[in-house]
């Protein structure tokens, strides 16, 4: 597994004997190779593509359909982005790569949740110096520092291409942070979804407002009060924790805010920068440097980040939004976000500063009502503009071999703006729902132009593939699996409010609880000798799962009398491989329009089993896999009748004459699919 050091320092040690061997960045092959270009549009939906092609609004994709082919692309079980992209990367089911949900649980700690794609492992204890504990990473101490570890198992398809000498470029692909190593020097990669911001989260904005009266944190953001005295306020920007302290504490940077006395404008002074903004304006990227205090006999450590300021409102209530603090691409420090590490220097030299965090469109700011719809669309537009610049860089660098480029816009904008039915929208009027769904249509037409530019540039000299990991649908109603389990006697006691959070109320009684829900699609049996407090015998597991599955499939929405659950998957029936035993016992596949309730994803219990989704996050895909397939287009004829994600890696290997490994069970898109194989993708 790939490991990177987190916030290490060299403690005044210089080793004259130290030498480094550096594999050349994206080493060119001495022979020419076929050209294969893959564009990944996260969440691009086949139904919407078909409708827009029929209406003449996606001419370039339609041309690909007619010249080569277009198919729905079978997605992963469940159809969550890290699961799906890991299946694309390995050409295998989740039992091989070990990612089953955004959220996994640690059975040794009963149901403690953790992020499925990466983890930070603690290092050695270090050297006690007053309030500090310092890792001595040099000889003779050789302390191990904390390290971020990629959890994804299996072998990525590009390792086989790298070994064969094929040049590979991969940009922003999810489920690959820290980026996997290139053993032969033919691959360069910029990591995407999973890259943290400088605070260690996955997108923590900071919001300063006169309407906020105390510092508070909510999912995705920190809210800070603004107290103006004579149109001036002294504020602090929160940075990374100083992990050299025995009790880690967040670092901060002071900055001053000056509101114009008469105009809708303000000035911000932070470190050596002055930022002047009018209401509604965004700043450029601003570099900020956080100081991490060290013992007095050592120099302090410094961490560089970047952020943008948005002056949301000057009067009557002052409001300032600051983006999550991203890793500085010109000075990433110990945070490796590219492979090889120096590849980020090439990108930054061309593009300057840009979003590096894995989640770039700030959906949390819209969900938490910090952004309006229009403001979120503007911010998402900044992200897309940067991605277009990055694509230009990638195409200019590309000569032959494999180029993979990923766009998040088609997913994260769709989560907030998709609405393709006459049903009542959770938060918008019918007119607003139509208007913002039109924003998704407009986005698809922009992506169609991207495809057109690439086809025009390379024509028939390259194999060009356009793909997505899953489709999309409305998220109208939410189903609280834990509430249902409680009401049906599987989760105890009858007044249980959470399996994790005592602040919610009565906790689960594990001596009586037989099953619980965690994550977006997972249900776990409280199995003896597996869960720390397990009570269900292995001999009773099968009957219990059959009983729960039958009851879930019978659940109907009292509002519409529609079935809520379309499919209940048994893990042993859909997963094989070394990690299969880590999977949930059941994977709940919801019907379109339904999804797991927000509360149930982290083990909480609502009052109602089924309720309206009232979040701005009004569309989703974490449902039954057959209801939200992705797309695949090609400029070469597709001969596979029922392609799926696990066919993509074999397709790419075949294009370069590389034999697929036994772990890949799919086949090339350009070869016929056997009848039996098509029935069991």
Model-identified regions with their sequence ranges:
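Bacterial Sec-dependent signal peptides at the C-terminal "C-region" and cleavage site
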Residues: 15-32
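A long, amphipathic alpha-helix that forms part
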Residues: 27-30, 377-403, 413, 419-466, ...
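Secreted, luminal/periplasmic, and some membrane-associated catalytic domains
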Residues: 32-34, 41, 55-56, 66-72, ...
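Second-shell loop/turn segments in exported
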Residues: 47-51, 146-147, 638
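A solvent-exposed, charged loop/short amphipathic helix patch at secondary-structure junctions
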Residues: 127-141, 419-438, 606-613
């Amino acid at each position: 597994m790939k490991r990177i050091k987190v916030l290490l320092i060299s403690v005044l040690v210089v080793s004259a004997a130290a030498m480094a061997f550096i594999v050349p960045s994206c080493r060119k092959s001495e022979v020419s190779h076929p050209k294969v270009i893959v564009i990944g549009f996260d969440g691009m939906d086949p139904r919407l593509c078909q409708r827009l092609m029929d209406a003449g609004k996606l001419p370039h994709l339609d041309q690909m359909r007619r010249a080569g082919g277009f198919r729905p692309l079978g997605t992963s079980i469940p159809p969550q982005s890290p699961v799906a992209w890991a299946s694309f990367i390995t050409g295998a089911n989740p039992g091989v790569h070990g990612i089953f949900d955004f959220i996994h649980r640690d059975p040794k700690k009963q149901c403690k949740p953790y992020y499925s794609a990466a983890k930070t492992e603690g290092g050695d204890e270090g050297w006690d110096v007053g309030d500090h504990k310092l890792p001595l990473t040099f000889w003779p101490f050789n302390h191990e520092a904390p390290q971020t570890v990629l959890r994804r198992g299996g072998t990525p398809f590009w390792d086989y291409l790298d070994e064969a000498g094929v040049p590979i470029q991969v940009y922003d692909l999810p489920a690959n942070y820290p980026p996997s190593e290139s053993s032969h020097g033919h691959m360069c990669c910029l990591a995407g979804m999973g890259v943290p911001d400088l605070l260690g989260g996955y997108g923590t904005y900071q919001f300063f407002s006169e309407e906020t009266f105390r510092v508070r944190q909510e999912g995705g953001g920190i809210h800070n009060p603004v107290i103006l005295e004579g149109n001036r306020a002294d504020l602090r920007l929160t940075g990374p924790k100083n992990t050299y302290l025995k009790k880690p504490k967040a670092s901060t940077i002071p900055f001053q805010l000056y509101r114009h006395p008469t105009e809708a404008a303000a000035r911000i002074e932070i470190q050596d920068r002055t930022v002047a903004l009018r209401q509604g304006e965004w700043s450029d990227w601003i570099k900020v440097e956080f100081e991490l205090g060290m013992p007095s006999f050592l120099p302090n450590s410094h961490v560089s980040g970047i952020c943008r300021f948005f002056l949301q409102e000057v009067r009557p209530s002052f409001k300032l939004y600051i983006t999550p603090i991203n890793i500085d691409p010109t000075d990433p420090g110990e945070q490796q976000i590219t492979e090889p590490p120096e590849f980020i220097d090439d990108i930054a030299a061309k593009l300057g500063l840009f979003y590096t965090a894995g989640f770039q469109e700030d959906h949390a700011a819209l969900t938490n009502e910090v952004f309006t719809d229009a403001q979120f669309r503007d911010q998402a537009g900044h992200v897309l503009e940067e991605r277009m610049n990055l694509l230009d860089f990638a195409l200019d660098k590309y000569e032959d071999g494999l180029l993979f480029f990923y766009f998040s816009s088609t997913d994260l904008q769709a989560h907030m703006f998709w609405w393709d039915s006459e049903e009542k929208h959770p938060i918008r009027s019918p007119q607003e729902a139509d208007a913002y769904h039109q924003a998704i249509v407009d986005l698809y037409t922009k992506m169609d132009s991207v495809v057109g530019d690439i086809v025009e540039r390379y024509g028939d000299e390259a194999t060009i593939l356009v793909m997505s990991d899953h489709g999309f649908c409305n998220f109208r109603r939410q189903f609280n699996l834990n509430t249902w389990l409680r009401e049906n006697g599987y989760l105890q006691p009858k007044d249980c409010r959470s399996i994790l959070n005592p602040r919610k109320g009565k906790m689960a009684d594990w001596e009586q609880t037989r099953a619980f829900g965690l994550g977006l699609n997972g249900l776990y049996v409280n199995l003896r000798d597996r869960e720390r407090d397990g009570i269900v015998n292995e001999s009773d597991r099968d009957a219990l799962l059959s009983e729960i599955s039958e009851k879930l499939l019978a659940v109907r929405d009292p509002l519409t009398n529609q079935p809520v659950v379309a499919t209940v998957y048994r893990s042993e029936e859909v997963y094989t491989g070394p990690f299969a035993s880590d999977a949930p016992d059941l994977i709940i596949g919801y019907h379109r329009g339904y999804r797991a309730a927000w509360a149930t994803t982290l083990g909480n219990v609502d009052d109602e089993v089924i309720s309206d989704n009232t979040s701005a996050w009004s569309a989703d895909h974490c449902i039954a896999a057959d209801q939200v397939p992705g797309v695949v287009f090609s400029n070469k004829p597709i001969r596979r009748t029922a392609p799926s994600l696990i066919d993509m890696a074999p397709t790419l290997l075949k294009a370069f004459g590389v034999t697929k490994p036994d772990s890949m069970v799919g086949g090339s898109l350009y070869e016929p699919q056997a009848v039996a194989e098509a029935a069991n993708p």
